[in-house]
Protein backbone atom coordinates (compact mmCIF):
# COMPACT_ATOMS: atom_id res chain seq x y z
CA UNK A 1 0.00 0.00 0.00
CA UNK A 2 1.33 3.43 -0.96
CA UNK A 3 2.33 5.79 1.83
CA UNK A 4 0.44 9.09 1.89
CA UNK A 5 1.96 12.56 2.05
CA UNK A 6 -0.14 15.61 2.94
CA UNK A 7 0.87 18.63 0.86
CA UNK A 8 -0.37 22.19 0.32
CA UNK A 9 -2.62 22.39 -2.72
CA UNK A 10 -0.45 25.16 -4.15
CA UNK A 11 2.83 23.25 -3.79
CA UNK A 12 5.00 23.64 -6.89
CA UNK A 13 4.36 20.96 -9.48
CA UNK A 14 8.03 19.98 -9.38
CA UNK A 15 7.63 19.11 -5.71
CA UNK A 16 4.51 17.08 -6.44
CA UNK A 17 6.23 15.25 -9.29
CA UNK A 18 9.22 14.43 -7.07
CA UNK A 19 6.91 12.71 -4.58
CA UNK A 20 4.81 10.98 -7.24
CA UNK A 21 7.89 9.58 -8.96
CA UNK A 22 8.98 8.19 -5.59
CA UNK A 23 5.72 6.24 -5.41
CA UNK A 24 3.77 8.18 -2.78
CA UNK A 25 0.08 9.03 -2.67
CA UNK A 26 -0.56 12.77 -2.41
CA UNK A 27 -3.29 14.33 -0.28
CA UNK A 28 -3.65 17.96 -1.38
CA UNK A 29 -5.21 20.35 1.13
CA UNK A 30 -5.90 24.07 1.26
CA UNK A 31 -6.25 23.96 5.04
CA UNK A 32 -3.17 22.46 6.69
CA UNK A 33 -4.24 23.03 10.28
CA UNK A 34 -3.67 20.01 12.50
CA UNK A 35 -7.42 19.41 12.84
CA UNK A 36 -7.88 19.43 9.06
CA UNK A 37 -4.97 17.07 8.45
CA UNK A 38 -6.13 14.62 11.14
CA UNK A 39 -9.68 14.64 9.77
CA UNK A 40 -8.68 14.22 6.12
CA UNK A 41 -5.59 12.01 6.20
CA UNK A 42 -5.05 10.32 9.58
CA UNK A 43 -3.12 7.57 7.79
CA UNK A 44 -0.51 9.95 6.33
CA UNK A 45 3.20 9.34 6.93
CA UNK A 46 4.41 12.86 6.11
CA UNK A 47 3.28 16.47 5.93
CA UNK A 48 4.78 19.32 3.92
CA UNK A 49 3.96 22.50 5.78
CA UNK A 50 4.19 26.14 4.73
CA UNK A 51 3.85 29.01 7.23
CA UNK A 52 0.49 28.17 8.83
CA UNK A 53 0.55 27.33 12.57
CA UNK A 54 0.52 23.59 13.20
CA UNK A 55 -0.79 22.61 16.61
CA UNK A 56 0.51 19.75 18.72
CA UNK A 57 -1.74 16.70 19.06
CA UNK A 58 -1.72 13.15 20.37
CA UNK A 59 0.43 11.15 17.95
CA UNK A 60 -2.03 8.26 18.14
CA UNK A 61 -4.30 10.34 15.91
CA UNK A 62 -1.71 9.98 13.12
CA UNK A 63 0.26 6.88 14.11
CA UNK A 64 2.18 6.66 10.80
CA UNK A 65 3.52 10.22 10.90
CA UNK A 66 7.32 10.32 10.53
CA UNK A 67 8.17 13.79 9.23
CA UNK A 68 6.85 17.34 9.08
CA UNK A 69 8.83 19.00 6.30
CA UNK A 70 8.80 22.80 6.40
CA UNK A 71 8.61 24.47 3.02
CA UNK A 72 11.07 27.23 3.98
CA UNK A 73 13.65 28.13 6.60
CA UNK A 74 11.73 29.36 9.65
CA UNK A 75 10.00 26.79 11.80
CA UNK A 76 8.40 28.83 14.58
CA UNK A 77 4.98 27.59 13.43
CA UNK A 78 5.72 24.02 14.52
CA UNK A 79 6.92 22.69 17.88
CA UNK A 80 10.06 20.81 16.83
CA UNK A 81 10.85 19.69 20.38
CA UNK A 82 7.39 18.18 20.89
CA UNK A 83 7.48 16.32 17.60
CA UNK A 84 11.00 15.06 18.19
CA UNK A 85 9.87 13.51 21.48
CA UNK A 86 7.09 11.80 19.53
CA UNK A 87 9.45 10.34 16.92
CA UNK A 88 8.66 12.84 14.17
CA UNK A 89 11.37 14.76 12.31
CA UNK A 90 10.89 18.46 11.59
CA UNK A 91 12.99 19.58 8.62
CA UNK A 92 13.63 22.83 6.76
CA UNK A 93 14.94 23.86 3.32
CA UNK A 94 17.88 26.16 4.14
CA UNK A 95 19.54 26.19 0.72
CA UNK A 96 16.44 26.81 -1.36
CA UNK A 97 15.66 30.49 -0.90
CA UNK A 98 18.64 32.38 0.57
CA UNK A 99 19.48 34.32 -2.59
CA UNK A 100 15.82 35.08 -3.25
CA UNK A 101 15.21 36.48 0.25
CA UNK A 102 18.41 38.53 0.02
CA UNK A 103 17.30 39.98 -3.33
CA UNK A 104 13.86 40.84 -1.95
CA UNK A 105 15.50 42.43 1.08
CA UNK A 106 17.48 44.70 -1.19
CA UNK A 107 14.46 45.41 -3.36
CA UNK A 108 12.71 46.77 -0.26
CA UNK A 109 15.80 48.70 0.84
CA UNK A 110 16.04 50.27 -2.62
CA UNK A 111 12.33 51.06 -2.60
CA UNK A 112 12.57 52.94 0.69
CA UNK A 113 15.83 54.69 -0.14
CA UNK A 114 14.37 56.10 -3.36
CA UNK A 115 10.71 56.43 -2.23
CA UNK A 116 9.67 54.34 -5.24
CA UNK A 117 6.29 52.98 -4.13
CA UNK A 118 5.23 56.19 -2.41
CA UNK A 119 6.19 58.33 -5.41
CA UNK A 120 4.46 55.96 -7.84
CA UNK A 121 1.26 56.08 -5.76
CA UNK A 122 1.33 59.89 -5.70
CA UNK A 123 1.99 60.07 -9.44
CA UNK A 124 -1.17 58.02 -10.05
CA UNK A 125 -3.07 60.73 -8.14
CA UNK A 126 -1.60 63.43 -10.38
CA UNK A 127 0.82 64.66 -7.72
CA UNK A 128 3.91 65.02 -9.89
CA UNK A 129 5.59 67.39 -7.43
CA UNK A 130 5.63 64.84 -4.61
CA UNK A 131 9.20 63.95 -5.57
CA UNK A 132 10.41 67.46 -4.72
CA UNK A 133 9.54 67.13 -1.03
CA UNK A 134 10.38 63.44 -0.76
CA UNK A 135 13.88 62.98 -2.08
CA UNK A 136 15.68 59.70 -1.55
CA UNK A 137 19.23 58.97 -0.48
CA UNK A 138 22.22 57.05 -1.81
CA UNK A 139 23.12 53.69 -0.32
CA UNK A 140 26.85 54.14 -0.97
CA UNK A 141 28.56 55.07 2.27
CA UNK A 142 25.56 54.22 4.43
CA UNK A 143 25.85 51.64 7.22
CA UNK A 144 23.82 48.46 6.88
CA UNK A 145 23.33 46.47 10.06
CA UNK A 146 22.57 42.77 9.62
CA UNK A 147 21.12 40.88 12.58
CA UNK A 148 21.52 37.17 11.94
CA UNK A 149 24.42 36.05 9.78
CA UNK A 150 23.32 32.72 8.39
CA UNK A 151 22.86 31.92 4.71
CA UNK A 152 20.48 34.82 4.07
CA UNK A 153 22.46 37.34 6.11
CA UNK A 154 25.63 36.45 4.20
CA UNK A 155 23.87 36.92 0.85
CA UNK A 156 22.57 40.31 2.00
CA UNK A 157 26.12 41.31 2.98
CA UNK A 158 27.41 40.40 -0.49
CA UNK A 159 24.80 42.63 -2.10
CA UNK A 160 25.53 45.47 0.32
CA UNK A 161 29.19 45.23 -0.61
CA UNK A 162 28.30 45.83 -4.26
CA UNK A 163 26.53 49.04 -3.22
CA UNK A 164 29.63 50.24 -1.32
CA UNK A 165 27.86 50.15 2.01
CA UNK A 166 29.57 49.79 5.36
CA UNK A 167 28.46 46.45 6.83
CA UNK A 168 27.92 45.72 10.52
CA UNK A 169 26.95 42.26 11.74
CA UNK A 170 25.40 41.08 14.98
CA UNK A 171 25.15 37.34 15.54
CA UNK A 172 26.16 35.82 18.90
CA UNK A 173 26.97 32.53 17.17
CA UNK A 174 29.39 34.02 14.63
CA UNK A 175 32.98 34.65 15.76
CA UNK A 176 34.69 35.66 12.51
CA UNK A 177 33.72 37.17 9.17
CA UNK A 178 35.52 38.03 5.95
CA UNK A 179 33.00 40.72 5.06
CA UNK A 180 31.94 43.61 7.26
CA UNK A 181 32.56 43.96 11.00
CA UNK A 182 31.13 42.09 13.96
CA UNK A 183 29.66 44.39 16.61
CA UNK A 184 27.70 44.01 19.82
CA UNK A 185 23.92 44.23 20.03
CA UNK A 186 23.78 47.82 21.23
CA UNK A 187 26.11 49.06 18.48
CA UNK A 188 24.12 47.39 15.70
CA UNK A 189 21.13 49.52 16.70
CA UNK A 190 22.95 52.78 17.38
CA UNK A 191 25.27 52.76 14.35
CA UNK A 192 23.10 51.41 11.53
CA UNK A 193 21.45 53.63 8.94
CA UNK A 194 19.47 50.61 7.79
CA UNK A 195 18.90 47.56 9.99
CA UNK A 196 17.74 44.27 8.49
CA UNK A 197 16.60 41.22 10.46
CA UNK A 198 17.45 37.66 9.44
CA UNK A 199 17.22 35.70 12.69
CA UNK A 200 15.18 32.71 13.70
CA UNK A 201 12.60 33.34 16.42
CA UNK A 202 13.44 31.83 19.81
CA UNK A 203 11.96 32.19 23.27
CA UNK A 204 14.94 34.41 24.11
CA UNK A 205 14.45 36.92 21.29
CA UNK A 206 10.67 36.92 20.77
CA UNK A 207 9.44 40.55 20.64
CA UNK A 208 12.98 41.47 21.70
CA UNK A 209 13.22 44.53 19.47
CA UNK A 210 11.13 47.28 20.99
CA UNK A 211 11.14 50.74 22.55
CA UNK A 212 14.62 50.47 24.06
CA UNK A 213 16.12 49.46 20.72
CA UNK A 214 14.24 52.16 18.80
CA UNK A 215 15.56 54.76 21.24
CA UNK A 216 19.08 53.59 20.39
CA UNK A 217 18.50 53.92 16.64
CA UNK A 218 19.09 57.07 14.62
CA UNK A 219 15.94 59.05 13.86
CA UNK A 220 16.94 58.74 10.19
CA UNK A 221 17.26 54.94 10.37
CA UNK A 222 15.16 52.34 8.57
CA UNK A 223 14.10 48.94 9.89
CA UNK A 224 13.76 46.09 7.39
CA UNK A 225 12.02 42.90 8.54
CA UNK A 226 11.72 40.00 6.14
CA UNK A 227 12.53 37.52 8.92
CA UNK A 228 9.65 36.95 11.32
CA UNK A 229 7.06 39.33 12.74
CA UNK A 230 7.58 37.93 16.22
CA UNK A 231 11.11 39.35 16.35
CA UNK A 232 9.67 42.84 16.88
CA UNK A 233 7.27 44.24 19.45
CA UNK A 234 4.76 45.51 16.92
CA UNK A 235 2.94 47.93 19.24
CA UNK A 236 6.23 49.58 20.15
CA UNK A 237 7.26 49.68 16.49
CA UNK A 238 4.00 51.45 15.66
CA UNK A 239 4.76 54.03 18.33
CA UNK A 240 8.32 54.53 17.06
CA UNK A 241 7.05 55.07 13.51
CA UNK A 242 4.22 57.38 14.57
CA UNK A 243 6.54 59.52 16.68
CA UNK A 244 9.33 59.42 14.04
CA UNK A 245 11.81 57.88 16.46
CA UNK A 246 12.94 56.03 13.34
CA UNK A 247 12.40 57.24 9.79
CA UNK A 248 10.61 54.24 8.38
CA UNK A 249 10.29 50.51 7.94
CA UNK A 250 9.78 47.81 5.34
CA UNK A 251 7.74 44.95 6.77
CA UNK A 252 7.10 41.65 5.02
CA UNK A 253 6.18 39.59 8.09
CA UNK A 254 3.74 40.13 10.94
CA UNK A 255 2.47 38.53 14.13
CA UNK A 256 -0.79 37.82 12.37
CA UNK A 257 -0.85 36.98 8.68
CA UNK A 258 -2.54 38.18 6.59
CA UNK A 259 -2.13 41.52 8.33
CA UNK A 260 -5.66 42.54 9.46
CA UNK A 261 -7.12 45.37 7.40
CA UNK A 262 -7.75 47.39 10.56
CA UNK A 263 -4.03 47.41 11.43
CA UNK A 264 -2.63 50.88 12.04
CA UNK A 265 0.37 50.00 9.87
CA UNK A 266 -1.83 50.69 6.82
CA UNK A 267 -2.31 54.28 7.96
CA UNK A 268 1.39 55.12 8.18
CA UNK A 269 3.10 56.73 5.20
CA UNK A 270 6.59 55.77 6.36
CA UNK A 271 6.03 52.01 6.08
CA UNK A 272 6.40 49.75 3.05
CA UNK A 273 4.12 46.71 3.51
CA UNK A 274 4.36 43.45 1.58
CA UNK A 275 2.44 40.20 2.24
CA UNK A 276 5.26 37.75 3.09
CA UNK A 277 6.81 37.73 -0.38
CA UNK A 278 10.49 37.35 0.59
CA UNK A 279 10.82 34.05 -1.27
CA UNK A 280 7.89 34.47 -3.62
CA UNK A 281 9.59 33.66 -6.91
CA UNK A 282 8.89 30.67 -9.12
CA UNK A 283 12.50 29.53 -8.70
CA UNK A 284 12.48 29.65 -4.91
CA UNK A 285 9.07 27.98 -4.66
CA UNK A 286 10.24 25.14 -6.87
CA UNK A 287 13.50 24.76 -4.94
CA UNK A 288 11.75 24.69 -1.56
CA UNK A 289 9.14 22.21 -2.79
CA UNK A 290 11.73 19.82 -4.22
CA UNK A 291 14.00 20.05 -1.17
CA UNK A 292 11.08 19.43 1.20
CA UNK A 293 9.94 16.51 -0.96
CA UNK A 294 13.42 14.99 -0.92
CA UNK A 295 13.51 15.17 2.87
CA UNK A 296 10.20 13.29 2.96
CA UNK A 297 11.55 10.66 0.59
CA UNK A 298 14.66 10.12 2.71
CA UNK A 299 12.74 9.66 5.94
CA UNK A 300 10.01 7.43 4.49
CA UNK A 301 12.71 5.27 2.93
CA UNK A 302 14.30 4.78 6.34
CA UNK A 303 17.14 7.29 5.95
CA UNK A 304 18.03 10.30 8.09
CA UNK A 305 17.01 13.70 6.71
CA UNK A 306 19.64 16.23 5.69
CA UNK A 307 18.16 19.30 7.40
CA UNK A 308 16.40 18.17 10.56
CA UNK A 309 16.03 20.82 13.27
CA UNK A 310 15.22 18.28 15.96
CA UNK A 311 16.31 14.87 17.16
CA UNK A 312 14.14 11.79 17.56
Place the predicted regions along the sequence by residue.
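N-terminal glycine-/charge-rich "phosphate-binding" loop or analogous flexible N-terminal tail
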Residues: 1-44, 164-168
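Phosphate-binding beta-alpha-beta segment of Rossmann-like dinucleotide-binding domains, i.e.
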Residues: 94-143, 158, 162, 170, ...
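Rossmann-like adenosine-cofactor binding region
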Residues: 53-59, 172-264
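Phosphate-coordination loops involved in phosphoryl transfer and adenosine-cofactor binding
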Residues: 2, 65, 140-143, 211, ...
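N-terminal Rossmann-fold NAD(P) dinucleotide-binding loop
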Residues: 153-154
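Glycine-rich Rossmann-fold phosphate-binding loop(s) that bind the pyrophosphate
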Residues: 149-150
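Phosphate/diphosphate ligand-binding glycine-rich loop within oxidoreductases
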Residues: 45-123
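C-terminal helix-to-coil terminal segments
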Residues: 2, 84, 91-104, 118, ...
